[in-house]
């Protein structure tokens, strides 16, 4: 009995329309596209949509900086985004924008239903206001000193140094990031979505088993801490949709952004004419709805979004498919290192299938971060796609074309081996279906090893030179081509461009349901190179080009030029270092050393012995006695030839005679902690 085809709607998170697509974005779109292409190969009806997230203060301000209207900026950005996604063969059925008539109508409809059902609450709040720009300031547009660790230049919602969260009003000496003016407090009436009213429904959804375990666990933490009402409005000036019957009030971008999924699908329905919007979004819809998103936006998609849909009488998502972040060479993407690589820059240098394959080989259904190691990227693509898969075709096609007029043999040389390959279809399909593409790739490459071992053992290049063995040569090479066909069928969701060239070469479409029937007596076309090896030089050029995309850095002079600032550490790392004020009671030369001084330090109740390499700077050690300095007090004792050193004194300078012992300000006492 044939399986009934599913009807599936798939979305990716909407890219924000104030910047270019980069390789971090591409992880999600590639993951979703692989899953969508597989579902289509299996006969399911899939509608794959996305849109630009085109509203909010950042877009309004960036357009002002560019001297253009926001509408022009988001239109240009949409064109760039769509070009990048097309370059990576992301098979969207529709790519739209949240700044659309469909989205305006649906946002108003959902808001109206929520309000009518009693889920919208009004209350007056106090906010920071920029008196020069005449606008209320979002959290990220206020900067000041962290109220917890006192780090300067921190955003209005959290500190990037100590990790603390707070409200913008708690900042010390806050400034508007827009004008630099000191903001003032003003009151404004805002509208709130009553999220706590949906707590029971959301907890039941969480426990349903549909969500990834990591997502469900995170949601439970939020439930335990208590859900809060959600502010869904912003005051003018704001680029977005005005709230019906509330002049000067606009929907917060995160209210209309997920509704953009619905707007993009509504736009597709209107274009096509054969799709029913309610079949996919109606309260009792039997179709499937999946959102591919990053772990940074789980909060909005797992709490606000299903609650909004429930409260406005629409269906909830079938599931959220959440992925981790992308690092490059083991670190956060960096513009200075050239590893913040835009999608458009990548496409100038490399085949999109290469990145699609590398991501696929690393992806699983878990919310794990993916590292794009550029050297491993080159090696893996060349080893797997070129050496294992494409090489299988090139090793056999030449003989088929030259000796047998491009026609494959009428029988399989090894039906048992061929069945081993086709039997793997079930487990590989399960892996793809469960978003375990890394597992699928491992199984496919294991088969590729078997196929190449078969060719190595049969040695067609030797058989070709032996008289009377044409039939053997024909059978061996035809078997090799058929194994290549099975492998490429399995790889079709991952490698669309290579698949297209392969289908032209094999003169047949690669379909999942046809692999059990080998190509027998079938004509193939002349073999042409199907895939080029990645040249590491090209990768290095891409990285260099990504560096050049930045504005020229100001030339550093002085001490920083000779001794650059080290890699950033976390506040927790810094907090492990215990620095104390110390009184130098005694300072003396160390016999047998022309670099060290022996210091006896008093820490207010405890005495330490420290050996310090400052002799060249302080030829008269007695001059140091009675002086206050700073020492690292919790450094592990170090056994030296002259004795045990029980800490380290702090000094500045390049070394030699240019060393300057640090001293605290007057009033500091021995033993005081340096913070």
Swiss-Prot record:
InterPro entries from the UniProt entry: aa-tRNA-synth_I_CS, Anticodon_Met, Met-tRNA-synth_bsu_C, Met-tRNA_ligase_1, Met-tRNA_synth, Methionyl/Leucyl_tRNA_Synth, MetRS_core, MetRS_Zn
Entry EC no(s): 6.1.1.10
GO biological process: methionyl-tRNA aminoacylation
Keyword terms of this UniProt record: Aminoacyl-tRNA synthetase, ATP-binding, Cytoplasm, Ligase, Metal-binding, Nucleotide-binding, Protein biosynthesis, RNA-binding, tRNA-binding, Zinc
Subcellular localization, as worded in the UniProt entry: Cytoplasm
Binding site for Zn(2+): 146, 149, 159, 162
PROSITE patterns tied to this protein: AA_TRNA_LIGASE_I, TRBD
Motif stretch ('HIGH' region): 15-25
UniProt cofactor note: Binds 1 zinc ion per subunit.
Protein name: Methionine--tRNA ligase
């Amino acid at each position: 009995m044939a399986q009934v085809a599913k009807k599936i709607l798939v979305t990716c998170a909407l890219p924000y329309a104030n910047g270019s697509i980069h390789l971090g974005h591409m992880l999600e779109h590639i993951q979703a596209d692989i899953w969508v292409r597989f579902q289509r190969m299996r006969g399911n009806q899939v509608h794959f949509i996305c849109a630009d997230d085109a509203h909010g203060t950042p877009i309004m301000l960036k357009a002002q900086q560019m001297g253009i209207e926001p509408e022009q900026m988001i239109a240009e950005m949409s064109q760039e985004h769509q070009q990048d996604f097309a370059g990576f063969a992301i098979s969207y059925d529709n790519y739209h924008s949240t700044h659309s008539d469909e989205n305006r109508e649906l946002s108003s409809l959902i808001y109206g239903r929520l309000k009518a059902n009693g889920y919208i609450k009004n209350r007056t709040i106090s906010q920071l206001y920029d008196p020069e720009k005449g606008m209320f300031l979002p959290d990220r547009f206020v900067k000041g000193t962290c109220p917890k660790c006192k780090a300067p230049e921190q955003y209005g919602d959290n500190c990037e140094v100590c990790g603390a969260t707070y409200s913008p009003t708690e900042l010390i000496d806050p400034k508007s990031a827009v004008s630099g003016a000191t903001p003032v407090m003003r009151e404004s009436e805002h509208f709130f979505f009553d999220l706590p009213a949906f707590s029971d429904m959301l907890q039941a959804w969480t426990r349903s088993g549909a969500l990834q375990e990591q997502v469900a666990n995170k949601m439970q933490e939020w439930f335990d801490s208590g859900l809060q009402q959600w502010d869904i409005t912003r005051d003018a000036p704001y680029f977005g949709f005005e709230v019906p019957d509330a002049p000067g009030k606009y929907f917060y971008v995160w209210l209309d952004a997920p509704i953009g999924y619905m707007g993009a699908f509504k736009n597709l329905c209107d274009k096509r004419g054969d799709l029913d919007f309610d079949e996919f979004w109606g309260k009792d819809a039997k179709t499937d709805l999946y959102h591919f998103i990053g772990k940074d936006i789980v909060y909005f998609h797992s709490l606000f979004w299903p609650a909004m849909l429930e409260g406005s009488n629409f269906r909830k998502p079938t599931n959220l498919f959440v992925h981790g972040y992308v690092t490059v060479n083991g670190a956060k993407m960096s513009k200075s290192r050239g590893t913040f690589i835009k999608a458009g820059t990548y496409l100038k240098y490399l085949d999109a299938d290469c990145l699609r394959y590398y991501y696929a080989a690393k992806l699983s259904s878990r919310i794990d971060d993916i590292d794009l190691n550029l050297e491993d990227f080159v090696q893996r693509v060349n080893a797997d796609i070129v050496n294992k898969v494409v090489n299988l075709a090139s090793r056999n096609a030449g003989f088929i074309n030259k000796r047998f007029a491009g026609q494959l043999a009428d029988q399989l040389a090894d039906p048992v081996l061929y069945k081993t390959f086709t039997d793997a279809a079930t487990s590989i399909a399960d892996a793809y279906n469960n978003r375990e593409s890394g597992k699928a790739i491992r199984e496919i490459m294991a088969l590729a090893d078997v196929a190449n071992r078969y060719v190595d053992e049969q040695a067609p290049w030797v058989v070709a030179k032996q008289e009377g063995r044409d039939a053997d040569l024909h059978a061996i090479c035809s078997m090799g081509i058929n194994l290549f066909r099975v492998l490429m069928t399995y790889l079709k969701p991952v490698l669309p461009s290579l698949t297209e060239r392969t289908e032209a070469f094999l003169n047949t479409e690669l379909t999942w349901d046809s692999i059990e029937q080998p190509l027998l007596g079938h004509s193939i076309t002349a073999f042409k190179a199907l895939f080029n090896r990645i040249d590491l030089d090209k990768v290095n050029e891409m990285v260099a080009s990504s560096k050049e995309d930045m504005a020229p850095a100001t030339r550093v002079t002085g001490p920083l030029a000779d001794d650059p600032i080290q890699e950033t550490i976390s506040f927790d790392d810094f907090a492990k270092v215990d620095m104390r004020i110390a009184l130098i009671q005694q300072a003396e030369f160390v016999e047998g050393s022309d670099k060290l001084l022996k210091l006896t330090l008093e820490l207010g109740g405890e005495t330490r012995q420290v050996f310090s390499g400052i002799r060249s700077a302080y030829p008269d050690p007695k001059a140091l006695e009675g002086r206050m300095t700073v020492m690292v007090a919790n450094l592990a004792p170090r056994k030296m030839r002259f004795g045990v050193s029980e800490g380290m004194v702090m000094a500045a300078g390049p070394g030699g005679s240019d060393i300057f012992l640090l001293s605290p300000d007057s009033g500091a006492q021995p033993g005081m902690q340096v913070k």
